[in-house]
């Protein structure tokens, strides 16, 4: 949910902040959807273009609100919330006809495909509840859709969830997601969850240490590490540990010296982070000062920590970077002992090493020798797995997440001439028509070694 200045800008869309208005709002939106006027491609394109101009004409106010509430530098404000949102809008305007067109089912066979004209209708689900979060409030809430905005916190969210929606999209923590999904279950409402988690980085003995330190320091600096995709902690091979630690400290200090770091969002989260550092048994290395003002925290490295250290007890969501001295085998074991993360970052120049880590772990996505980049791949799904989320979005995959793919088929009326056997009384003489021959020709008694890859047949 949004903070004060951001709430004011978001409220320019169509804001409903009183819980007493929520039922009315949901009813009005459902009535609008039921009228059918929001379903046409023309209407959706028009709405997308209105969103573009809303962002474009209010750009200075958006930037000012993000700076006021989050203390972010203009470059950090523009990159995700302005650039990211405008890019999404353009992609949807350009692609929505292609995504929404009725699609013939080409592999449906003679009966259903050619004769029955089997096809998929791409129909919008209906009224969707999007529960965004404060770290990227515009990018994560004003995604292409028809909007009524509610700003607030847990109380407003709880009241909203008493209403029935056709889909719920939530960005936030796994703890709150459990509450969201429990409320959604009462109405059998499907959900998409983007949750984050403790995203690890692995720096192997073959890594470019300079590059790894520079890029990990940068993502811990961005939005003061308050990003679901930020590196939470780093596993470093003992043979390059000291070199990496030295370079990481260098780049963190360099970033802090710019004065461009934003602050921690509120006093509660600031206190949570300070408490984790104070209780740590690792070596705490302060790498410079944070911004002036309240809730200010500079970059911090915590070295020589274990998995049971206080700074490893939860997703950090701050400018703190625990460093664990572990070789690849130990790092894989440690990663698999924790909830599945939204992202995994592997720094290595050894392809076999990289493949070993990828195949030995599970995560929402993977970026090699960089950070967060997999989330920006065009035409690719983005989402978590396990405790880091469920479902996908971005581009076509977000469109499909809010779409019901409705199968339609038109069997010809003369079909009874060839399928009359389906009606009672049943004639056992037609039993052969229900037999399924082994058209692939595989044999009983085959072993795993007999299986041929790259072919639909097993010989």
Predicted regions and their residues:
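N-terminal Rossmann-like NAD(P)+-binding subdomain of aldehyde/semialdehyde dehydrogenases
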Residues: 2-120
């Amino acid at each position: 949910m949004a903070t004060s200045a951001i709430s004011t800008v978001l409220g320019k869309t169509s804001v409903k902040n009183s819980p007493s208005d929520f039922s009315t709002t949901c009813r009005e939106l459902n009535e609008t959807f039921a009228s059918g006027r929001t379903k046409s491609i023309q209407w959706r394109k028009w709405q997308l273009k209105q969103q573009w101009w809303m962002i474009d004409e209010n750009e200075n106010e958006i930037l000012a609100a993000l700076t006021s509430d989050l203390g972010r530098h203009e470059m950090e404000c523009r990159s995700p919330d302005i650039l990211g949102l405008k890019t999404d809008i353009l992609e949807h305007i350009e692609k929505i006809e292609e995504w929404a067109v009725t699609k013939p089912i080409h592999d449906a066979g003679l009966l259903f495909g050619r004769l029955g004209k089997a096809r998929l209708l791409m129909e919008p689900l209906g009224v969707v509840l999007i529960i965004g979060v404060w770290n990227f409030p515009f990018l994560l809430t004003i995604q292409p859709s028809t909007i009524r905005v509610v700003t607030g916190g847990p109380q407003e969210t709880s009241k909203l969830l008493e209403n029935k929606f056709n889909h719920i999209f939530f960005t936030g923590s796994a703890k709150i997601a459990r509450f969201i999904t429990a409320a959604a279950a009462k109405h059998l409402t499907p959900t998409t969850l983007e949750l984050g988690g403790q995203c690890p980085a692995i720096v192997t003995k073959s890594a470019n240490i300079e590059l790894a330190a520079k890029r990990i320091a940068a993502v811990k600096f961005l939005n003061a590490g308050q990003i679901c995709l930020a590196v939470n902690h780093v596993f470093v091979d003992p043979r390059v540990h000291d070199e990496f630690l030295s370079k990481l400290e260098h780049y963190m200090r360099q970033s802090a010296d710019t004065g461009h770091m934003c602050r921690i969002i509120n006093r509660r989260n600031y206190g949570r982070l300070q408490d984790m550092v104070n209780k740590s048994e690792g070596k705490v290395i302060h790498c410079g000062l944070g911004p002036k003002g309240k809730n200010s925290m500079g970059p911090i490295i915590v070295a020589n920590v274990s998995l049971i250290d206080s700074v490893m007890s939860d997703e950090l969501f701050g400018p703190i970077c625990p460093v664990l001295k572990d070789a690849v085998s130990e790092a894989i074991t440690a990663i698999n002992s924790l909830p599945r993360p939204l992202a995994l970052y592997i720094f290595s120049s050894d392809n076999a090493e990289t493949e070993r880590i990828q195949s030995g772990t599970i995560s929402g996505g993977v970026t090699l020798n960089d950070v967060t980049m997999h989330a920006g791949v065009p035409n690719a799904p983005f989402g978590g797995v396990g405790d880091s989320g469920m479902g996908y979005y971005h581009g076509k995959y977000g469109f499909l997440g809010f779409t019901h793919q409705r199968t339609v088929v038109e069997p010809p009326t003369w079909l009874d001439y060839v399928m009359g056997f389906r009606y009672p009384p049943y004639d056992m003489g037609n039993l052969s028509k229900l037999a399924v021959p082994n058209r692939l020709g595989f044999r009983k008694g085959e072993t795993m070694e007999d299986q041929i890859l790259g072919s639909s047949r097993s010989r």
